[in-house]
Amino acid sequence: MLDVHPSGFYAWLQQPHSQRHQADLRLTEQIKQFWLESGCVYGYRKIHLDLRDSGQQCGVNRVWRLMKRVGIKAQVGYRSPRARKGEASIVSPNRLQRQFNPDAPDESWVTDITYIRTHEGWLYLAVVVDLFSRKIIGWSIQSRMTKDIVLNALLMAVWRRNPQKQVLVHSDQGSQYTSHEWQSFLKSHGLEGSMSRRGNCHDNAVAESFFQLLKRERIKKKIYGTREEARSDIFDYIEMFYNSKRRHGSSEQMSPTEYENQYYQRLGSV
């Protein structure tokens, strides 16, 4: 059941259905949907941002008014996870320099971490993306944001691709990436590190773009009761849809796998 006051909600429903009132009804349904997707913790400011991102044009005061009218409010005491502050041990220069379209696979990879809400708690996802095809070549999901999550994602990428030449691996300056373990892994596998400038998310725009797609096309449409449900659904999105089927404008409207296959077919015919 929603934490909504029935008397206020049903009294409001019985008002004359003016054009404005009908628009408010539709908007309130969207507000309730975003509120549910947040685990019932979002207030009017965050829900306004979700509405804006979905293409809905409305003022923040209108969202506040409608939420107050039907009794929807944020649940306090439930905060988003914060990245732990670690010592910035080793920071690599920004060697990628926003060169997001290499000429071949396994020239440049980008990596990043995001978090997913479940009723059991937070779940963290690290991915490695090949910039040539936008394919997710490595990923790892854990309930804690430790160094292992980024190392496991990169290990999967190395195992799957087995690059025969040095690959540039770009990340932000999160503590997982500035650790000695990360730098040691890069060196031992013949990889070269690159990092975004501090506080500049556009330096890692492709990884950010994938997370936006994942959340818009899958996560925001679901409410995960358990971490295992989320893991299974994210596996399905990455391996069964995104890599093999999802078309990309940057890849001539082909999926990442199709785009790479076409590249190797052309290479073999030369």
Regions found by a protein language model. Give the residues of each.
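Charged DNA-binding/catalytic regions of mobile-element recombinases
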Residues: 1-270
